[in-house]
């Protein structure tokens, strides 16, 4: 049971790491969220993004 708990915690930590690195800020300057849609589509395959602190964030 102790080994199962350790494996479960390791799996959760790895999953969080993978999910947070998958999407995020990309190196594209912007002034409006609509400028990020095409850039995010090219990088992540999804057109979901917004302009945050003059930099595109993709979801």
UniProtKB/Swiss-Prot annotation:
Q: Which UniProt keywords apply?
A: Calcium-activated potassium channel impairing toxin, Disulfide bond, Ion channel impairing toxin, Neurotoxin, Potassium channel impairing toxin, Secreted, Signal, Toxin, Voltage-gated sodium channel impairing toxin
Q: Which residues cross the membrane?
A: none
Note the Pfam families from the entry: Toxin_2
Instruction: Kindly list the GO molecular function terms attached to this UniProt entry.
Output: ion channel inhibitor activity; potassium channel regulator activity; sodium channel regulator activity; toxin activity
Disulfide bridge partners, by residue number: 30-51, 36-56, 40-58
Q: Quick one: where is this thing mainly located?
A: secreted
N-terminal signal peptide: 1-22
Q: Where is this site: Aromatic residue of the functional dyad?
A: 59
Q: Name one GO cellular component term.
A: extracellular region
User: Which protein are we looking at?
Assistant: Potassium channel toxin alpha-KTx 16.2
Would you identify the family this protein belongs to, as annotated? Belongs to the short scorpion toxin superfamily. Potassium channel inhibitor family. Alpha-KTx 16 subfamily.
- Annotated function: Alpha-KTx 16.2: inhibits large conductance calcium-activated potassium channels (KCa1.1/Slo-beta4 KCNMA1/KCNMB4). It appears to block channel activity by a simple bimolecular inhibition process. Shows a fast association rate and a slow dissociation rate of binding on rat brain synaptosome. Significantly inhibits voltage-dependent sodium current and voltage-dependent delayed rectifier potassium currents.
Q: What is known of its domains?
A: Has the structural arrangement of an alpha-helix connected to a beta-sheet by disulfide bonds (CSalpha/beta).
Site (Important for the inhibitory effect on KCNMA1 channels): give the residues: 38
Q: Which species is this UniProt entry from? A: Olivierus martensii (Manchurian scorpion)
Query: Do you know which Gene3D superfamilies this protein is assigned to?
Result: Knottin, scorpion toxin-like
């Amino acid at each position: 049971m102790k080994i199962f708990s350790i494996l479960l915690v390791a799996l959760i930590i790895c999953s969080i790491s993978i999910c947070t690195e998958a999407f995020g800020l990309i190196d594209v300057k912007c002034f409006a969220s609509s400028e990020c849609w095409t850039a995010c589509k090219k990088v992540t395959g999804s057109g979901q993004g917004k302009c945050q602190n003059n930099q595109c964030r993709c979801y």
